[in-house]
Design a protein with these regions (language model features):
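N-terminal Sec-pathway targeting helices
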Residues: 1-14
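Charged, low-complexity, helix-prone segments enriched in Lys/Glu/Asp/Gln
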Residues: 1-3, 101, 105-112
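Membrane-interface motif at the C-terminal end of an N-terminal transmembrane signal
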Residues: 14-38, 334
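Compositionally biased, low-complexity segments of secreted and virulence-associated proteins
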Residues: 109-158, 169-170, 176-334
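Alpha-helical protein-protein interaction scaffolds
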Residues: 34-107
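N-proximal short alpha-helices
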Residues: 1, 33, 49, 117-120, ...
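Solvent-exposed, acidic/flexible segments
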Residues: 57, 69, 73, 137, ...
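Short acidic/polar alpha-helix capping motifs at helix-coil junctions
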Residues: 25-28, 41-44, 114-115
Length: 334
């Protein structure tokens, strides 16, 4: 009799284990895929977006509609491109509305207005205004404007933005390299402009701001720069550049230049707004380097992926990592 009880308990335990295995297996499979993809941003984002779509199949369409409501045609187009890649049907008429919004945003009058704004103010949030910003920086107008403005504040003991000052100082030297290399350093130049613009409009992530601030302070001799910019002027660009060069520590600029290059890579594949989105969520230069890999793989879909997943589009976050390990370990314990 006891033997029958033991057999019954064994069978019941086996059945329970089998049921638990069946319930856990899909989650364990996803967890395993996440762990294996943690060093590949493109594959990682695919896995997580597919999971999000299983939970809410309308997420992409909702994202596109919200982007249109926010007057962000570029983001809306990113969502429709992602929908096409994933084979997701969009609500009737949504794709046509997105195309019309993109056409309007790219109109000649709108582009010219935003280019002029970027050139004069040095602030950008799209391709046209960034083109104006980069043009201003390539003609050294933009960087000298920033060096003079922030440098004067520093010289007068006011609260100067030393990050913008440091980026502008690096930019003056990179601009010279761009001319020498017949444009070869333009992606780095554009990247520096975007980091600077993101800082000005409060779209640079806290972690990246802290890192870039430390790096920027290291590339200039503050007392020498303070003395140099005390007499600097946009009207005397040659004198200003020479003064900044004297205070510049080229050997310390490598990290900022690498960051700018990665930002430029994101911009080339995902657009200016895509690069600015990345700068907002990045916790440091490694995040931006991973974003460059994501953008090179996903192109125009990058903004939608970042919007849906946040920083999770770039790396396996601590919460997701711990959950994946827990599910995987639970399966092995059966």
């Amino acid at each position: 009799m006891k033997g029958f009880w033991r057999i019954g308990l064994t069978l019941a335990g086996a059945a329970a284990s089998a049921a638990a295995f069946a319930a856990l297996w899909p989650h364990a499979r996803d967890a395993s895929a996440l762990l294996l993809a943690q060093d590949d941003p493109a594959q990682l984002s695919d896995i997580q977006v597919n999971s999000a779509l299983r939970t809410n199949a309308a997420a992409i369409g909702q994202g596109a509609a919200q982007a249109l409501a926010d007057n962000d045609a570029d983001l809306a187009k990113s969502f429709t491109d992602l929908a096409q890649d994933k084979g997701v049907a969009l609500p009737s008429g949504l794709a046509a509305r997105v195309d019309a919004a993109v056409t309007d945003e790219n109109s000649t009058a709108s582009t010219a207005r935003r280019f002029a704004t970027g050139f004069v103010t040095g602030e950008a949030d799209d391709v046209a205004s960034l083109s104006g910003t980069v043009a201003g920086d390539l003609f050294v107008f933009g960087d000298i404007r920033d060096v003079v403005r922030e440098g004067k504040r520093l010289a007068m003991g006011e609260n100067a933005d030393q990050l913008v000052l440091g980026l502008a100082s690096v930019g003056l030297l990179v601009t010279a390299a761009t001319y020498v290399s017949a444009g070869g350093a333009t992606p780095v130049r554009a990247g520096l402009s975007m980091v600077k613009d993101a800082r000005k409009v409060g779209r640079l992530g806290a972690g990246l701001t802290e890192w870039a601030g430390r790096s920027a302070r290291g590339v200039v001799d503050a007392p020498m720069l303070q003395q140099a910019v005390a007499t600097a002027s946009i009207a005397r660009p040659g004198q200003t550049i020479s003064a900044v060069k004297a205070a510049f520590k080229a050997e310390k600029a490598g990290a900022l230049v690498r960051l700018a290059k990665d930002v430029g890579r994101v911009s080339e594949k995902a657009g200016t707004k895509g690069a600015l989105d990345v700068l907002r969520i990045a916790d440091g230069p490694k995040d931006v380097a991973r974003a460059a890999k994501l953008a090179e793989s996903k192109g125009s879909q990058t903004r939608a992926l970042v919007k849906i997943l946040g920083r999770g589009a770039l790396l396996l976050t601590a919460g997701a990592f711990n959950l994946a390990w827990w599910v995987f370990a639970a399966l092995l314990a059966l």
